[in-house]
């Protein structure tokens, strides 16, 4: 089992990470933030960090995402999340689509937190 808590939303290539995980395990736990335009656009403290929703292709499949910028957080002495200035936040549906495409048929959700201070988040347990 791969345990990826607080990792996916810091990636520049989140689908690639999920694909790599799918090659080494048939079970995965993920806790992650995801992009939801309706929620984030109504949060003044968050919306300035995100570009508009866009799409990209990975292995011929389209996924929706928003680029998130760490902005001033990169200057913090503590951990801000990643060494790069940006990360890719997939939409909730794109995360689920990617897991299904990678063969994870049994997907369970929990700990949905729409009002998390850093943006909407949820946990997933998935197995092939």
Enumerate the predicted regions with their spans.
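S-adenosyl-L-methionine-dependent methyltransferase catalytic module, highlighting the catalytic core
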Residues: 4, 12-125
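Conserved SAM-binding site of S-adenosyl-L-methionine-dependent methyltransferases, i.e.
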Residues: 8
